[in-house]
Amino acid sequence: TYSVGGLILSNSGAITANYWLSEIYDQEIADAHKSGAIHLHDLSMLTGYCAGWSLKQLIQQGLGIPGKINSTPASHLSTLCNQMVNFLGIMQNEWAGAQAFSSFDTYLAPFVKVDNLSQKEVKQCIQSFVFGVNTPSRWGTQAPFSNITLDWTVPRDLENLPAIVGGKEQDFTYGDCKKEMDMVNKAFIEIMTEGDADGRGFQYPI
């Protein structure tokens, strides 16, 4: 699909790739890439490839950009889902490849517990996250390339730690949130299975 943002990305990417091949790599490597003997991935971007991030840090500190805008730690699941989408979008502007969150279900579960959310409410929150990371908001009108991991059961290194909501420790642990983890996972699977309004499958998160 044509877009001005996509055209800008294509043109700037070609210029950046030529810079890599003429100024960074030696002639032998550049020639090998041009001939197809080897492939240098994402030459169109002068940056690192993929990165993984701790949801715990976002939950404890909130989302802020120096000199731009600062958000306090999320106190509700809907707010956290919005912050996650924004975080992934921001990080994708600085990296070429995927941005990942680990223990997605474990860290979201306490927010479900604190607000005593229903399955329908959980699904609405997760739905906003999934649609958010599939919106072509990244530079070049691309959706943020995002990965998450689901624990299914609370990891041993987290099960006895106080759960964090709103940047504060709660009077229960992550291990006390297995029921809420199941709710998050159920909602996620249903949303990914159902697809968008036209029934198309979602590309992200992987």
Where are these regions (language model features)?
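Conserved catalytic cores of very large enzyme subunits
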Residues: 1-206
